[in-house]
């Protein structure tokens, strides 16, 4: 079970976007995350009339390492760590500070 999943609200704790919040769009296999609207990079694309792609400079989200982000706890309005707890035979994610379920 992963500590950070898709659609979790996170806060960046290190790097050029430190302090910014966003939602996880994609979790990659090599412990990296794509977050909406953060870590934007410019990519030069060639026009491709076959697929209708217009050329130019395109801004897109680049992956961030999972160690540079923390899950955002809406109850405390701070970054928090995630732990696990077994409840009714199911393993659930909980915030370390409040011991409340992340997915609640």
UniProtKB/Swiss-Prot annotation:
One of its GO terms (molecular function) is structural constituent of ribosome. This is Large ribosomal subunit protein uL24. One of two assembly initiator proteins, it binds directly to the 5'-end of the 23S rRNA, where it nucleates assembly of the 50S subunit. One of the proteins that surrounds the polypeptide exit tunnel on the outside of the subunit. Belongs to the universal ribosomal protein uL24 family. Transmembrane segments: none annotated. Part of the 50S ribosomal subunit. It holds the Pfam family ribosomal_L24. One of its GO terms (biological process) is translation. The keyword rRNA-binding applies. Keywords: Ribonucleoprotein, Ribosomal protein, RNA-binding, rRNA-binding. InterPro entries: KOW, Rib_uL2_dom2, Ribosomal_uL24, Ribosomal_uL24_CS, Ribosomal_uL24_KOW, Translation_prot_SH3-like_sf. One of its GO terms (cellular component) is ribonucleoprotein complex. SMART domains: KOW.
């Amino acid at each position: 079970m992963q500590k950070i999943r898709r659609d979790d609200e996170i806060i960046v704790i290190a790097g050029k976007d430190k302090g910014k919040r966003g939602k996880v769009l994609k979790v990659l296999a090599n412990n990296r995350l794509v977050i909406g609207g953060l870590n934007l990079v410019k990519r030069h694309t060639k026009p491709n009339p076959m697929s209708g792609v217009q050329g130019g400079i395109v801004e897109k989200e680049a992956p961030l390492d999972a160690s540079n982000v923390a899950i955002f706890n809406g109850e405390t309005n701070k970054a928090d760590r995630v732990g696990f707890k077994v409840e009714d035979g199911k393993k659930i994610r909980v915030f370390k500070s409040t011991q409340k379920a992340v997915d609640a």
